[in-house]
Amino acid sequence: MLEVDCTMLTPEVVLRTSGHVARFADWMCKDKASGEIFRADHLVEQVLEDRLKSDKEARGQVIGPDDPTSNKKKLKIKKKAPIKLDDEKVALYDRYLAQVGAHPCLVTDMQIDNLSGDELARIIKDEDIRNPQTGGVLEPPVPFNLMFETQIGPSGDKQGYLRPETAQGQFLNFQKLLDFNNSRMPFASASIGKSFRNEISPRSGLLRVREFLMAEIEHFVDPRNKKHDRFKEVEGQVCAFLPRGVQDAGSTQTLKDTIGHAVETKMVDNETLGYFLARIWMFLEKIGCDMSKVRFRQHMRNEMAHYASDCWDAELLTSYVSPPVSTFLCRLQ
């Protein structure tokens, strides 16, 4: 594996070519009266979860400290008397939050994350979602690019960005890395460094900040042959998978399967991707993670990076939220 240390400043042409300028964005909505800004999917998730919690209280159900719908990362909302929802509304909110059939430890907000701007606007309108603190009416969601823009040089005519991830530097140096490896494939490179994202509403402690340290490994393979010569060593490893087909059905019930069978049935795209999924599962187990609270979640088609053919997150449930601790991308060739 080759180590590479790349610049944090990236010329605009690089990120325009990679698609980041056009697509690296979240949906943002604004309070018409106060001008307060919200990330639309997080706001919708927050309001629906609070309404479900209020419904449980109205029905006399106890909300324990470990209840997955309990709100630990949200904006402050004025305490109101519990309001009971009709059963159809509860079922609708559960589908939006992908809680149907879920393991109680593995509730997530995947459905909300997958919604388009028009879909978020429809929910905000239909469910009368407003500013939680003031009750102000919200404008329709608009895309907000998450990259920090800057001008390079004294004349300011060269546009650039602070890198949103460390991968682009490795791609730009691919030819040099290949030459250093005597033009042999496959090979890998690794980079550790600061990345920057202009988050709409940074919250969740250190999990969503505008400047953070990240580590990325790029394993370069021949696109005509994505087999891995050590795949046999891990093909019997059993992992918990949440494939996109299950998510499409509105469920978060994980499937236990071996890496070998997952690759054979094409749930996982290829052997190389499967090999590294197995290795990270074994690594998390070795460092002491409770594996009943770990899963691999496959990105939905409209959720995947525009350059990916398959993508899985290793998600680890913590006492705070369920963040992805690692992401595996099989990039288009």
Task: Give the ranges of each region predicted by the language model.
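TRNA-recognition modules of translation machinery and tRNA-sensing kinases, especially anticodon-binding
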Residues: M1-Q333
